[in-house]
Amino acid sequence: MLPIVVSILLATPLALCQAPFWMPNMQQFSFLTETDFRNALLLPTTNTRRVRSLYHDMRIPFQRFKRGGGVAVAAEKDKWPNGRVPYILSAAYTSAQRAVLARAFDTYAKRTCIRFVPKSPADKDYIVIQKLDGCYADFSRVGGRQQVSLADECIDYATIIHELMHVIGFIHEHQREDRDSYVSILYQNVIQGANTDFDKLSNLGLSYYGEHYDYSSIMHYEANEGSRNGKNTIEAKNSHFTAIMGKASDFSTSDLRRVNRAYKCSIFAF
């Protein structure tokens, strides 16, 4: 079933429409349409694994480190109220790409209480999804306009739901404070300048809602993510899990429990 917000969209196609007067910079932006959500239902459910490297894909404002608090997700004040995330979407995406985006939005709506909804004139905090320079997103609700970059190489279902997890406040699994009990980081193999993407985020005061470290999380890097020489940058303490890390094509059960607990999604069992 389509998210409730879809039914209130304009009946005319929006992919190439001029932005309403309240959209920033009068650029070409749009929203997903009912057609996009119908097309999403026609997409194959196989071969959805991400194909693009994701190191350096999360941006955390400096003040967030000083404030602390959070949930492996952000502090309460940095969450999106009632799980509602207003968005505007670049009109540069093709109909096929919009269908993949719609599938990601619809999955959040069906399996959590997170709703990505068209930005209204009253919404001051919102995300802008554009084709910029790779795949990345601002961490949690930062206030005002915030960026989600999904370039052409990022338009696969797994990458999109991963980046949207950053938007609602979730960090990478290998950056948990307790990660040293589960994985080893091989900094000697990490691309120069990317060490911070492998550091623990121990000063954010994160909580994990009772969920153990999850090698199958959609938020986990692959073993050779961000490698400068093709060798592993992350290895599981139990070598069996090294081949599993970063191979997720969808949310893990633990991912969904964390989202639903963090946002108090009472209609979902968690």
Curated annotation (Swiss-Prot):
GO cellular component terms listed in the entry, alphabetical order: extracellular region
Signal sequence region: 1-17
Binding positions (Zn(2+)): 162, 166, 172
Swiss-Prot/TrEMBL cofactor(s): Zn(2+)
Pfam family name, one: Astacin
Active-site residue list: 163
Annotated disulfide bonds: 113-265, 135-154
The entry's keywords: Disulfide bond, Hydrolase, Metal-binding, Metalloprotease, Protease, Secreted, Signal, Zinc, Zymogen
Compartments where located: Secreted
EC number(s) reported in the record: 3.4.24.-
InterPro entries: Astacin-like_dom, MetalloPept_cat_dom_sf, Peptidase_M12A, Peptidase_Metallo
GO biological process: proteolysis
UniProt-recorded Gene Ontology molecular function terms: metalloendopeptidase activity; zinc ion binding
Residues annotated as domain Peptidase M12A: 71-266
Cofactor note: Binds 1 zinc ion per subunit.
Residue ranges of coiled coil: none
Record's function text: Metalloprotease.
Protein name, as recorded: Zinc metalloproteinase nas-1
Source organism per UniProt: Caenorhabditis elegans
